[in-house]
Amino acid sequence: MTGVAAPERIARAVRADIRALTAYPVADAAGCIKLDAMECPYELPAEVRDDIARAARETPLNRYPAAANPALQAQVRQAFEVPAQAGLLFGNGSDELIHLIIQACCEPGDTVLSPWPSFVYFDMAARLSHARFVGVPLTAGLELDLPATLAAIEAHQPKVVFLALPNNPTGGLWPDAAVRAILDAAPGLVVLDEAYQPFAGHTWMPRIMDEPNAVVMRTVSKIGLAGLRFGYLAGHPAWIAEFDKVRPPYNMDVLSQAVLAAVLRHKPVLDAQADRLHADRQPLADGLAALPGVTVFPSAGNFVLARFCGKLDGNAVHLALKTRKILVRNFSNAHPLLADCLRISVGTPTENAAVLSALQDILSA
Protein backbone atom coordinates (compact mmCIF):
# COMPACT_ATOMS: atom_id res chain seq x y z
CA MET A 1 0.00 0.00 0.00
CA THR A 2 3.02 2.29 0.02
CA GLY A 3 2.87 5.08 -2.47
CA VAL A 4 -0.91 5.57 -2.23
CA ALA A 5 -1.70 9.27 -1.88
CA ALA A 6 -2.88 10.35 1.57
CA PRO A 7 -6.25 11.70 0.31
CA GLU A 8 -7.02 8.29 -1.18
CA ARG A 9 -6.16 6.56 2.08
CA ILE A 10 -8.36 8.99 3.95
CA ALA A 11 -11.23 8.43 1.52
CA ARG A 12 -11.00 4.68 2.10
CA ALA A 13 -10.62 4.87 5.87
CA VAL A 14 -12.70 7.82 7.07
CA ARG A 15 -16.50 7.78 6.99
CA ALA A 16 -17.97 9.87 4.19
CA ASP A 17 -20.21 11.79 6.59
CA ILE A 18 -17.18 12.73 8.71
CA ARG A 19 -15.22 13.90 5.66
CA ALA A 20 -18.14 16.17 4.78
CA LEU A 21 -18.01 17.92 8.17
CA THR A 22 -15.98 20.94 9.19
CA ALA A 23 -14.24 21.22 12.54
CA TYR A 24 -15.91 23.35 15.20
CA PRO A 25 -14.64 26.91 14.65
CA VAL A 26 -13.06 28.84 17.53
CA ALA A 27 -12.19 32.45 16.73
CA ASP A 28 -8.82 33.89 17.68
CA ALA A 29 -9.68 36.12 20.64
CA ALA A 30 -6.28 37.71 21.23
CA GLY A 31 -6.75 41.40 21.97
CA CYS A 32 -10.52 41.20 21.52
CA ILE A 33 -13.60 41.81 23.63
CA LYS A 34 -14.87 38.24 23.73
CA LEU A 35 -18.66 38.00 23.78
CA ASP A 36 -19.13 34.97 21.52
CA ALA A 37 -19.10 31.91 23.79
CA MET A 38 -21.31 32.63 26.84
CA GLU A 39 -18.33 32.50 29.18
CA CYS A 40 -18.21 34.29 32.50
CA PRO A 41 -16.08 37.40 31.92
CA TYR A 42 -14.81 37.54 35.50
CA GLU A 43 -11.64 35.82 36.64
CA LEU A 44 -11.68 34.05 39.97
CA PRO A 45 -10.45 36.07 42.97
CA ALA A 46 -6.88 35.65 44.18
CA GLU A 47 -7.84 33.62 47.24
CA VAL A 48 -9.69 31.10 45.07
CA ARG A 49 -6.75 30.85 42.67
CA ASP A 50 -4.45 30.28 45.64
CA ASP A 51 -6.61 27.37 46.78
CA ILE A 52 -6.56 25.99 43.23
CA ALA A 53 -2.76 26.17 43.13
CA ARG A 54 -2.53 24.43 46.49
CA ALA A 55 -4.88 21.68 45.36
CA ALA A 56 -2.91 21.17 42.14
CA ARG A 57 0.38 20.91 44.03
CA GLU A 58 -1.05 18.26 46.32
CA THR A 59 -2.59 16.15 43.54
CA PRO A 60 -0.56 13.07 42.50
CA LEU A 61 -0.25 12.95 38.72
CA ASN A 62 1.39 9.53 38.53
CA ARG A 63 -1.85 7.69 39.28
CA TYR A 64 -5.02 7.33 37.27
CA PRO A 65 -8.15 8.99 38.66
CA ALA A 66 -10.26 6.93 41.03
CA ALA A 67 -13.30 5.28 39.47
CA ALA A 68 -15.51 7.25 41.86
CA ASN A 69 -14.89 10.33 43.96
CA PRO A 70 -17.39 10.22 46.83
CA ALA A 71 -16.05 13.41 48.40
CA LEU A 72 -16.47 15.39 45.17
CA GLN A 73 -19.89 13.87 44.59
CA ALA A 74 -20.92 15.06 48.04
CA GLN A 75 -19.62 18.56 47.26
CA VAL A 76 -21.48 18.70 43.95
CA ARG A 77 -24.70 17.50 45.56
CA GLN A 78 -24.48 20.17 48.24
CA ALA A 79 -23.32 23.01 45.98
CA PHE A 80 -25.92 22.41 43.27
CA GLU A 81 -28.76 20.95 45.37
CA VAL A 82 -28.81 17.53 43.72
CA PRO A 83 -31.34 15.29 45.54
CA ALA A 84 -29.70 12.76 47.82
CA GLN A 85 -31.59 9.88 46.18
CA ALA A 86 -30.53 10.81 42.64
CA GLY A 87 -27.77 9.07 40.77
CA LEU A 88 -24.92 11.36 39.70
CA LEU A 89 -22.51 10.99 36.79
CA PHE A 90 -19.60 13.28 35.90
CA GLY A 91 -18.57 14.03 32.33
CA ASN A 92 -15.75 15.82 30.57
CA GLY A 93 -18.09 18.70 29.87
CA SER A 94 -21.75 18.19 29.05
CA ASP A 95 -20.65 17.37 25.47
CA GLU A 96 -19.34 14.01 26.68
CA LEU A 97 -22.55 13.37 28.60
CA ILE A 98 -24.58 13.96 25.43
CA HIS A 99 -22.44 11.35 23.68
CA LEU A 100 -22.83 8.85 26.50
CA ILE A 101 -26.62 9.22 26.56
CA ILE A 102 -26.98 8.70 22.81
CA GLN A 103 -24.51 5.81 22.75
CA ALA A 104 -26.34 4.07 25.56
CA CYS A 105 -29.83 4.61 24.14
CA CYS A 106 -29.63 4.59 20.36
CA GLU A 107 -29.16 1.86 17.79
CA PRO A 108 -28.21 3.03 14.28
CA GLY A 109 -31.25 4.70 12.76
CA ASP A 110 -32.99 5.47 16.06
CA THR A 111 -34.31 8.99 16.48
CA VAL A 112 -33.00 11.81 18.66
CA LEU A 113 -35.35 14.80 18.78
CA SER A 114 -35.13 18.40 19.94
CA PRO A 115 -36.85 21.72 19.32
CA TRP A 116 -34.76 23.52 16.72
CA PRO A 117 -32.62 25.56 16.48
CA SER A 118 -31.00 24.58 19.76
CA PHE A 119 -27.59 23.41 20.97
CA VAL A 120 -25.83 22.23 17.82
CA TYR A 121 -24.15 19.30 19.55
CA PHE A 122 -27.47 17.49 20.01
CA ASP A 123 -27.55 17.07 16.23
CA MET A 124 -23.84 16.37 15.79
CA ALA A 125 -23.62 13.75 18.54
CA ALA A 126 -26.66 11.95 17.14
CA ARG A 127 -25.22 11.80 13.64
CA LEU A 128 -21.80 10.69 14.90
CA SER A 129 -23.57 7.74 16.54
CA HIS A 130 -25.52 6.91 13.35
CA ALA A 131 -28.77 8.02 14.95
CA ARG A 132 -31.31 10.10 13.06
CA PHE A 133 -31.77 13.64 14.33
CA VAL A 134 -35.17 15.34 14.06
CA GLY A 135 -35.23 19.05 14.78
CA VAL A 136 -38.73 20.45 15.33
CA PRO A 137 -38.76 24.09 14.14
CA LEU A 138 -39.54 26.78 16.66
CA THR A 139 -42.20 29.35 15.85
CA ALA A 140 -41.36 32.46 13.85
CA GLY A 141 -40.98 34.24 17.19
CA LEU A 142 -38.48 31.57 18.33
CA GLU A 143 -40.87 30.06 20.86
CA LEU A 144 -41.50 26.36 21.40
CA ASP A 145 -44.06 24.95 18.97
CA LEU A 146 -45.64 22.49 21.38
CA PRO A 147 -48.25 20.99 19.00
CA ALA A 148 -45.56 20.36 16.38
CA THR A 149 -43.23 18.89 19.00
CA LEU A 150 -45.87 16.51 20.32
CA ALA A 151 -46.79 15.51 16.77
CA ALA A 152 -43.14 14.81 15.98
CA ILE A 153 -42.78 12.69 19.11
CA GLU A 154 -45.83 10.67 18.09
CA ALA A 155 -44.58 10.27 14.52
CA HIS A 156 -40.91 9.49 15.19
CA GLN A 157 -40.98 7.79 18.62
CA PRO A 158 -37.59 9.20 19.65
CA LYS A 159 -35.31 7.27 21.97
CA VAL A 160 -34.01 10.58 23.35
CA VAL A 161 -35.51 14.08 23.50
CA PHE A 162 -33.22 16.98 24.38
CA LEU A 163 -34.77 20.13 25.88
CA ALA A 164 -32.41 23.03 26.55
CA LEU A 165 -33.84 25.03 29.47
CA PRO A 166 -33.15 27.87 28.67
CA ASN A 167 -32.60 27.28 24.98
CA ASN A 168 -29.35 28.13 23.23
CA PRO A 169 -29.01 30.18 21.04
CA THR A 170 -32.44 31.77 21.37
CA GLY A 171 -32.58 32.24 25.15
CA GLY A 172 -36.17 31.09 25.53
CA LEU A 173 -37.27 29.17 28.63
CA TRP A 174 -40.06 26.76 27.77
CA PRO A 175 -43.05 26.79 30.18
CA ASP A 176 -43.36 24.02 32.75
CA ALA A 177 -46.70 22.97 31.27
CA ALA A 178 -45.09 22.43 27.87
CA VAL A 179 -42.20 20.46 29.36
CA ARG A 180 -44.73 18.41 31.32
CA ALA A 181 -46.60 17.58 28.11
CA ILE A 182 -43.36 16.47 26.43
CA LEU A 183 -42.41 14.33 29.43
CA ASP A 184 -45.80 12.65 29.30
CA ALA A 185 -45.61 12.06 25.54
CA ALA A 186 -42.01 10.91 25.14
CA PRO A 187 -41.60 7.13 24.82
CA GLY A 188 -37.93 7.22 25.84
CA LEU A 189 -35.64 9.53 27.79
CA VAL A 190 -36.01 13.31 28.09
CA VAL A 191 -32.78 15.18 28.84
CA LEU A 192 -33.37 18.52 30.55
CA ASP A 193 -30.25 20.51 29.64
CA GLU A 194 -29.89 23.21 32.30
CA ALA A 195 -26.55 24.65 31.17
CA TYR A 196 -27.88 28.19 31.68
CA GLN A 197 -29.98 27.48 34.76
CA PRO A 198 -27.96 29.84 37.03
CA PHE A 199 -29.29 32.77 35.00
CA ALA A 200 -32.87 31.53 34.65
CA GLY A 201 -33.96 31.24 38.26
CA HIS A 202 -35.74 27.99 37.44
CA THR A 203 -34.84 24.31 37.63
CA TRP A 204 -36.27 20.82 37.43
CA MET A 205 -33.57 19.43 39.72
CA PRO A 206 -35.70 19.24 42.92
CA ARG A 207 -38.35 17.30 40.97
CA ILE A 208 -36.08 14.95 39.05
CA MET A 209 -36.81 11.94 41.27
CA ASP A 210 -40.50 12.36 40.43
CA GLU A 211 -39.76 12.03 36.69
CA PRO A 212 -39.08 8.40 35.75
CA ASN A 213 -38.11 9.23 32.16
CA ALA A 214 -36.00 12.37 32.67
CA VAL A 215 -32.51 13.40 33.71
CA VAL A 216 -31.06 16.85 34.39
CA MET A 217 -27.79 17.76 32.69
CA ARG A 218 -25.65 20.72 33.74
CA THR A 219 -22.20 22.22 33.28
CA VAL A 220 -19.99 24.56 35.29
CA SER A 221 -18.81 26.30 32.10
CA LYS A 222 -21.19 29.25 32.30
CA ILE A 223 -20.51 30.17 35.93
CA GLY A 224 -16.80 30.85 35.60
CA LEU A 225 -15.21 27.46 34.93
CA ALA A 226 -15.39 27.03 31.14
CA GLY A 227 -11.74 26.00 31.03
CA LEU A 228 -12.35 23.14 33.45
CA ARG A 229 -14.61 21.02 31.18
CA PHE A 230 -16.88 19.54 33.82
CA GLY A 231 -20.48 18.47 33.43
CA TYR A 232 -22.81 16.39 35.56
CA LEU A 233 -25.93 14.34 35.02
CA ALA A 234 -28.54 13.65 37.71
CA GLY A 235 -31.54 11.35 37.67
CA HIS A 236 -32.87 7.99 38.78
CA PRO A 237 -29.93 5.74 39.71
CA ALA A 238 -31.09 3.13 37.19
CA TRP A 239 -30.60 5.60 34.30
CA ILE A 240 -27.23 6.75 35.62
CA ALA A 241 -26.02 3.16 35.97
CA GLU A 242 -26.68 2.51 32.28
CA PHE A 243 -24.83 5.64 31.16
CA ASP A 244 -21.92 4.79 33.43
CA LYS A 245 -21.41 1.58 31.44
CA VAL A 246 -20.37 3.56 28.33
CA ARG A 247 -18.33 6.16 30.19
CA PRO A 248 -14.67 6.00 29.13
CA PRO A 249 -12.37 4.83 31.93
CA TYR A 250 -10.71 7.69 33.79
CA ASN A 251 -12.72 10.29 31.86
CA MET A 252 -12.32 12.96 34.54
CA ASP A 253 -8.65 13.77 35.12
CA VAL A 254 -7.31 14.26 38.63
CA LEU A 255 -6.50 17.95 38.15
CA SER A 256 -10.03 18.82 37.02
CA GLN A 257 -11.46 17.03 40.04
CA ALA A 258 -9.03 18.68 42.44
CA VAL A 259 -9.62 22.14 40.98
CA LEU A 260 -13.40 21.76 41.11
CA ALA A 261 -13.23 20.62 44.72
CA ALA A 262 -11.16 23.69 45.59
CA VAL A 263 -13.47 26.10 43.76
CA LEU A 264 -16.66 24.65 45.23
CA ARG A 265 -15.41 25.61 48.67
CA HIS A 266 -15.96 29.16 47.38
CA LYS A 267 -19.39 28.54 45.81
CA PRO A 268 -20.72 31.98 46.91
CA VAL A 269 -18.15 33.55 44.56
CA LEU A 270 -19.62 31.65 41.61
CA ASP A 271 -23.15 32.55 42.70
CA ALA A 272 -22.27 36.24 42.95
CA GLN A 273 -20.79 36.21 39.44
CA ALA A 274 -23.90 34.56 38.04
CA ASP A 275 -26.14 37.05 39.85
CA ARG A 276 -24.16 39.93 38.40
CA LEU A 277 -24.49 38.63 34.85
CA HIS A 278 -28.21 38.06 35.43
CA ALA A 279 -28.59 41.67 36.57
CA ASP A 280 -26.59 43.03 33.62
CA ARG A 281 -28.55 41.06 31.00
CA GLN A 282 -31.58 43.34 30.87
CA PRO A 283 -29.63 46.60 30.48
CA LEU A 284 -27.76 44.99 27.57
CA ALA A 285 -31.03 43.82 26.02
CA ASP A 286 -32.60 47.25 26.48
CA GLY A 287 -29.59 48.93 24.90
CA LEU A 288 -29.77 46.63 21.90
CA ALA A 289 -33.52 47.11 21.52
CA ALA A 290 -33.02 50.88 21.39
CA LEU A 291 -30.82 50.61 18.30
CA PRO A 292 -32.42 51.20 14.87
CA GLY A 293 -33.56 48.08 13.05
CA VAL A 294 -32.77 45.70 15.92
CA THR A 295 -35.18 43.12 17.35
CA VAL A 296 -34.24 41.52 20.67
CA PHE A 297 -35.62 38.15 21.78
CA PRO A 298 -36.39 37.41 25.44
CA SER A 299 -33.52 35.57 27.12
CA ALA A 300 -33.18 33.60 30.34
CA GLY A 301 -29.49 32.87 29.71
CA ASN A 302 -26.27 34.85 30.03
CA PHE A 303 -26.62 36.10 26.48
CA VAL A 304 -28.98 38.04 24.24
CA LEU A 305 -30.05 37.11 20.71
CA ALA A 306 -30.70 40.09 18.44
CA ARG A 307 -31.84 40.34 14.81
CA PHE A 308 -30.42 43.14 12.65
CA CYS A 309 -32.88 44.14 9.93
CA GLY A 310 -31.88 47.73 9.22
CA LYS A 311 -29.65 48.98 6.43
CA LEU A 312 -27.01 46.45 7.52
CA ASP A 313 -27.76 42.76 7.84
CA GLY A 314 -26.42 40.39 10.47
CA ASN A 315 -23.38 39.36 8.44
CA ALA A 316 -22.36 42.96 7.85
CA VAL A 317 -22.82 43.92 11.49
CA HIS A 318 -20.83 40.87 12.61
CA LEU A 319 -17.95 41.80 10.32
CA ALA A 320 -18.03 45.43 11.43
CA LEU A 321 -17.82 44.37 15.08
CA LYS A 322 -14.99 41.99 14.28
CA THR A 323 -12.98 44.77 12.66
CA ARG A 324 -13.39 46.64 15.95
CA LYS A 325 -12.07 43.55 17.78
CA ILE A 326 -15.43 42.69 19.33
CA LEU A 327 -16.36 39.03 18.95
CA VAL A 328 -20.01 37.94 18.96
CA ARG A 329 -21.55 34.78 17.50
CA ASN A 330 -23.08 35.07 14.04
CA PHE A 331 -26.07 32.78 13.43
CA SER A 332 -27.21 34.51 10.24
CA ASN A 333 -26.52 31.48 8.07
CA ALA A 334 -27.08 28.75 10.67
CA HIS A 335 -30.84 28.30 10.26
CA PRO A 336 -33.60 30.19 8.39
CA LEU A 337 -35.27 31.12 11.69
CA LEU A 338 -32.01 32.80 12.77
CA ALA A 339 -31.54 34.95 9.68
CA ASP A 340 -29.56 38.11 10.53
CA CYS A 341 -29.27 37.07 14.19
CA LEU A 342 -26.24 37.67 16.39
CA ARG A 343 -25.85 36.19 19.86
CA ILE A 344 -24.09 38.49 22.31
CA SER A 345 -22.83 37.19 25.65
CA VAL A 346 -23.35 39.35 28.70
CA GLY A 347 -19.92 40.74 29.57
CA THR A 348 -18.64 43.14 32.16
CA PRO A 349 -20.39 46.53 32.28
CA THR A 350 -17.42 47.98 30.40
CA GLU A 351 -17.64 45.31 27.69
CA ASN A 352 -21.40 45.71 27.38
CA ALA A 353 -21.01 49.46 27.00
CA ALA A 354 -18.32 48.94 24.38
CA VAL A 355 -20.44 46.67 22.19
CA LEU A 356 -23.45 49.00 22.45
CA SER A 357 -21.31 52.00 21.55
CA ALA A 358 -19.77 50.17 18.61
CA LEU A 359 -23.19 49.09 17.34
CA GLN A 360 -24.50 52.63 17.65
CA ASP A 361 -21.64 53.84 15.45
CA ILE A 362 -22.01 50.98 12.97
CA LEU A 363 -25.77 51.36 12.55
CA SER A 364 -25.75 55.14 12.33
CA ALA A 365 -22.89 55.42 9.84
Swiss-Prot record:
Matches recorded under SUPFAM superfamilies: PLP-dependent transferases (SSF53383)
GO BP terms in the entry: L-histidine biosynthetic process
Q: Which residues cross the membrane?
A: none
The record, for Pfam families, names:
Aminotran_1_2 (PF00155)
What pathway does the annotation place this protein in? Amino-acid biosynthesis; L-histidine biosynthesis; L-histidine from 5-phospho-alpha-D-ribose 1-diphosphate: step 7/9
Q: Which cofactor does it need?
A: pyridoxal 5'-phosphate
**What EC class does the entry list?**
transferase
Q: Which domain of life is it from?
A: Bacteria
Enzyme Commission number(s) from the entry: 2.6.1.9
- Cited InterPro entries: Aminotransferase_I/II_large, HisP_aminotrans, PyrdxlP-dep_Trfase, PyrdxlP-dep_Trfase_major, PyrdxlP-dep_Trfase_small
Describe the protein's quaternary organization and the partners it interacts with. Answer: Homodimer.
The Swiss-Prot or TrEMBL record describes its family as follows:
Belongs to the class-II pyridoxal-phosphate-dependent aminotransferase family. Histidinol-phosphate aminotransferase subfamily.
Identify the HAMAP family for this entry.
Answer: HisC_aminotrans_2
Q: Kindly provide the name given to this protein in its UniProt entry.
A: Histidinol-phosphate aminotransferase 2
The taxonomy runs: Bacteria, Pseudomonadati, Pseudomonadota, Betaproteobacteria, Burkholderiales
- Name of the gene this protein is made from: hisC2
